[in-house]
């Protein structure tokens, strides 16, 4: 098993480490996600939206922990560390448009039968998030994927190693 190290640009020291997954562990995690996705997608849209927004709110409550962590991981000055406003706004917007964006699209050119396009969850959405705005860029794909009934496998940049942990702890 290999170790991933986040080296702080502030002092050149290792700030955080995480073990990589073995191939077996990665396959087990994918299977766990497949199982979880069935139950998740069976929840009503309104419930998925509520749970996603509760998670967003929980991240907001962690802001005092998150900002100094980002400063250490990325070297971003603390005064520029607050991403929660944009994070929350993006998630709220996606929640607000979800019902309309996910509704069936009716195609009517013959009154004798009904045709429509129905959006269905894909399953597992793999998100590779960049380091520069690690929360705001991640929520752009995580929120719509979860709201639509998918589950997410998240891989963050090495330089923002702890962001994924913050997101899974909510």
Locate predicted features.
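Conserved small-residue-rich beta-alpha loop and adjacent elements
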Residues: 106-168
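Hydrophobic alpha-helical segments that mediate membrane insertion or helix-helix packing
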Residues: 12, 48, 145-146, 170
């Amino acid at each position: 098993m290999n170790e991933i190290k986040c080296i702080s640009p502030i002092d050149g020291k290792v700030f955080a480490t995480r073990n990589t997954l073995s191939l077996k562990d990665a396959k087990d995690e994918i299977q766990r996600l497949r199982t979880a996705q069935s139950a998740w997608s069976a929840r009503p849209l309104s419930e998925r939206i509520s749970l996603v927004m509760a998670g967003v709110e929980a991240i907001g409550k962690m802001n005092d922990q998150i900002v100094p962590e980002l400063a250490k991981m990325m070297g971003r000055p603390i005064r520029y560390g607050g991403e929660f406003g944009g994070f929350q706004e993006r998630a709220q917007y996606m929640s607000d448009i979800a019902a309309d964006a996910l509704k069936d699209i009716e195609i009517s050119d013959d009154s004798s039968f009904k045709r429509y396009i129905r959006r269905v969850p894909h399953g597992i959405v793999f998100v590779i998030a960049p380091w520069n705005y690690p929360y705001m860029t991640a929520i752009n794909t995580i929120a719509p994927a979860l709201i639509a009934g998918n589950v997410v496998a998240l891989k963050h940049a090495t330089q923002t190693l702890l962001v994924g942990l913050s997101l899974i702890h909510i």
